[in-house]
Regions:
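Histidine/cysteine-enriched polar flanking segments
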Residues: 1-287
Length: 287
């Protein structure tokens, strides 16, 4: 998923519809149109719903990234008004506004959109909460409406960094948090940073996974993307030295060029239709 602004609005999951922004329980109408119109003015905006055991439909919390902004206890009929104020840079005038320092992980469990999200996401959310409680870690876990890419379920976004992950198994949750504590990406499940463009995310995720396969921890930056054709692009990535830089030099120059091609494959179209194969396309790292 890519956006310049991610907005999560707390709303009980029992009211979510297939299209989250057309949910029930008194959820305000017009947010989908608002999102599309404001995206033209402010860059792409992505609005998702979020739920936990304390969520109700009387008042909502609104979380906005980047920037760690939160609006607490907002009445449903005030949500669009508050969002307008935020994007007018008048957010500090709002009595609802607070600067927020808590770390949050949003996991897609949106079963009404695709059963895979509920089947895999729910378990990971529960195991993750248990692990955090056991380790006494102050990180919030929220269940989210559809984040995109249900074939990668369970999908999640880790904020404030905006790292997205897919196919994270329950067994890998301890090592995921061990890496996180060291400010390391968990490369096997990494899908890219959501604030980067589509091609930058693809390149970054593939290179992190490639480094992992070589036993390396990559500290890299995508410096340039060039689209060659509809089915090919290249990137230039810069690798920054750390204590393992001599090992890097076996595989990379300080700045290296990589090619990606788009390939077709077949897999089930979703957990709703496991017997129906669908032709999909996926980018692959060539060199």
């Amino acid at each position: 998923p890519y956006a310049e602004h991610f907005i999560f609005i707390s709303w009980p999951k029992k009211f979510w519809g297939y299209d989250a922004l057309q949910s029930k329980g008194g959820f305000p109408s017009g947010l989908k149109d608002w999102m599309q119109k404001k995206s033209y003015l402010h860059g792409k905006i992505s609005i998702r719903l979020a739920s936990n055991k304390n969520t109700n439909n009387k008042k909502s919390d609104i979380f906005i990234y980047p920037g760690n902004h939160i609006y607490r206890d907002v009445y449903p009929n005030k949500i669009i008004e508050i969002l307008d104020l935020h994007f007018q840079k008048n957010f500090k005038q709002s009595n609802y506004y607070k600067k927020y320092n808590n770390e949050q992980i949003f996991i897609c469990t949106h079963g009404r959109h695709d059963k895979c999200c509920a089947k895999y996401g729910q378990k990971v959310a529960e195991v993750m909460r248990q692990h955090l409680e056991k380790e006494d870690l102050n990180i919030e876990v929220w269940e989210s409406s559809h984040l995109g890419g249900h074939r990668f379920a369970p999908t999640l976004i880790d904020f404030p960094n905006g790292y997205s992950y897919g196919r994270l198994s329950s067994d890998n949750i301890p090592i995921f948090f061990e890496n996180r504590k060291k400010n390391k990406i968990f490369a096997p499940a990494y899908r890219g940073k959501v604030f980067l463009s589509e091609f930058e995310q693809i390149a970054e995720a593939h290179l992190q996974q490639y480094c992992y396969s070589k036993g390396l921890r990559c500290n890299l930056e995508i410096k340039k993307i060039k689209k060659i054709s509809e089915k090919k692009f290249m990137c230039i990535a810069k690798f920054y030295p750390d204590e393992f830089f001599e090992k890097y030099q076996k595989y990379f120059a300080e700045e290296s060029t990589f090619d990606f091609i788009l390939k077709e494959f077949k897999n089930p179209s979703g957990c709703d239709s496991t017997n129906e194969n669908k032709i999909r396309e996926c980018w692959e790292l060539q060199n």
